[in-house]
């Protein structure tokens, strides 16, 4: 199946609910986001390992190439809870407003995954000396259970990492 355009990937990720919250009534599974990413990355030749962290909660570690070291492009697949009444647009629909794409998770941080898939596409037909790893964790917005599960699994990750979390350019 052909890879959707970056904008279509972005829209699909935004449309997939994945609220993480300590209040059970608001908490949602992130499986739909993980399935989208694993499908696209798998079609590109990545080896995809989906780790169930708890019921309905999953991490994805996708690797291209093999061996020690490498680069990890890391982010989380969940969003904060939202109130429809506080949005001027549908939070689960990618919408262009004043030349910017908006939607729940567009910046923090589902959009990161669409951007990195687009960025690495031209590199995938070249041999890699070390692996490229794409990591999507669950529950960063609430309990950090995805990151904890990854650490507890003890799987070595790359030598360097880029974390796509927005910072407001503050270290």
Label every PLM stretch briefly.
Residues 4, 52, 84-86, 93, ...:
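Short secondary-structure boundary/capping segments
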Residues 21-24, 104-105, 171:
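A generic structural signal for short coil/turn motifs at secondary-structure boundaries
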Residues 51, 105, 139:
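Glycine- and other small-residue-rich loops at beta-strand/loop junctions that grip anionic moieties
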Residues 70-136:
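Active-site metal-coordination/substrate-binding segment of hydrolases
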Residues 109-171:
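Acidic/histidine-rich catalytic neighborhood of metal-dependent amide-processing enzymes
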